[in-house]
Amino acid sequence: IGSGLVGSEMCIRDRLIIILQFAIKRSSRNHKSRNQQFLERESRANQVRRKDISNLNYISIPDNLPLINSGNETFNQLLSNNSGMMRSYNTITGLKDKKILNLTGISNTELKLSYGAANLTELTEYDDNFTTLIKAIASLGHALIDNNDTADALSFLEYGISIGSDISSNYIDLAIIYAATDRFDDIRKLKEKAGMLKSLSRDNIIEQLNNMLK
């Protein structure tokens, strides 16, 4: 009986080894196939000629955002006393004359296929400008709330959402302002907007907004 059990165990072990070897080989083949497909697609992308990108959906920074030295004494005083807030504000205003594009969720290969490899450097710069902008907006909006300036925070945070920010604090801070004045329909609209995001932060944002609606 003992030898029979040993033989049975060895048979099972041998089967498991064969199955494992097969799975490894199949995984290796799939990986090679995906890698080959990527290389072929990347090669095609690198051969696409430069295309006109002047009519893309560029983001502009509006003139109706709160400004220093415009008669808003609360805003002036807060920024003059807080270097972090002033830094975020200067970042935002410093991007006014730069090109900004929200290219979140679009790979470099896709950009080259759509607009030509020669445009990749410029497009990456414009997307980096977008990332810099939404970070500064979220930071400034949060700081304004902390300093009880919800009116100015509202302006910046709503602008951030309007241009497609995927920063969690932008959504949550804005929802907090809405909740304080029972604007729950606006929180629901925020949730709909968050559902359109292509970022990893989407599910977490939606979950937090759902909790605020309970």
Residue ranges and their predicted role:
Residues 136-137, 171:
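TPR repeat positional signature
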